[in-house]
Amino acid sequence: MNVQHEVSLLVGEIQRLGSKNADGQTCVKFGVLFNDDRCANIFEALVGTLRAAKRKKIIAFEGELLLQGVHDNVDITLLQE
């Protein structure tokens, strides 16, 4: 699977699991995304896909690296629907 395809799948999963914030952008907590069974089956390296999407300015989140447990409450915001 190529990175662009995984990023597009990630956008769909954020839209499925997330909700709109005050600015009208879709947000989801990292823990919700990480612990979702469907996401676990789709993404071999979820954190790598998140970093690739962040570099492409498709999503935004605080920090550079998200770790399970430690960063479960970090918001991932979809910048491009």
From Swiss-Prot:
Any GO BP annotation: regulation of actin filament-based process
Protein family membership: Belongs to the costars family.
Source organism (scientific name): Salmo salar (Atlantic salmon)
Protein name as catalogued:
Costars family protein ABRACL
> Which InterPro entries does the UniProt record give?
Costars, Costars_dom, Costars_sf
